[in-house]
């Protein structure tokens, strides 16, 4: 079977399977990225707080998650959560191993890891803010919420966008590791297809092309967002 038939959308083609796996990759990557953004906001807030305990917790979180291999984090989440679920199920008479949702575990693992990187990105963005504008807002009588919404958030988002875009690209690549726990995303589908047809090069080449396509499109989206965020600044220069 030639490449066009193998990756086609006919009865013997794998085109639909690869597209479904691509959609799954994007879904788990976006979910993990969003979870990581939440962890990143919390971590950045803790690292910038006046509390020594919160600063230590944020530092420990980023140091640990950036030091542990991502694959090991995925295994810890999967087997740890599955063990807890199995123990709880045994209380109700169930026996044997009960696996957790691979999508949920994968998204959580990616989110916790990416959150460590997003913590640093968001912390740097806040530290880069124009302190004069913040003091001017306070002098004008702005409350904390209004000050955050009108001054801190717009500027911090502008400074954070390049770093957040880099974290998104990292998350896309990390999503391939979730194949080890059985989630049928792009890498897992390529493994299944290559094993079934004994044509691994065709499947991994297609997977690489699809990853590059996702990376290129998302890179353009972030580049456009960065350009739009700088418009007001450029007009003011």
Swiss-Prot record:
InterPro entries: AA_ABC_transptr_permease_3TM, ABC_transp_permease_HisMQ, MetI-like, MetI-like_sf. CDD domains: TM_PBP2 (cd06261). The keyword Ribosomal protein does not apply. Keywords: Cell inner membrane, Cell membrane, Membrane, Plasmid, Transmembrane, Transmembrane helix, Transport. Induction: By octopine. One of its GO terms (molecular function) is transmembrane transporter activity. GO terms for cellular component: ATP-binding cassette (ABC) transporter complex. It is a multi-pass membrane protein. The keyword ATP-binding does not apply. The chain crosses the membrane at residues 26-46, 72-92, 96-116, 201-221. Belongs to the binding-protein-dependent transport system permease family. HisMQ subfamily. Component of the octopine active transport system probably consisting of four subunits: Q, M, P and T. NCBIfam families: HEQRo_perm_3TM. PANTHER family: ARGININE ABC TRANSPORTER PERMEASE PROTEIN ARTQ, CATIONIC AMINO ACID TRANSPORTER, MEMBRANE COMPONENT. This is Octopine transport system permease protein OccQ. It comes from Rhizobium radiobacter (Agrobacterium tumefaciens).
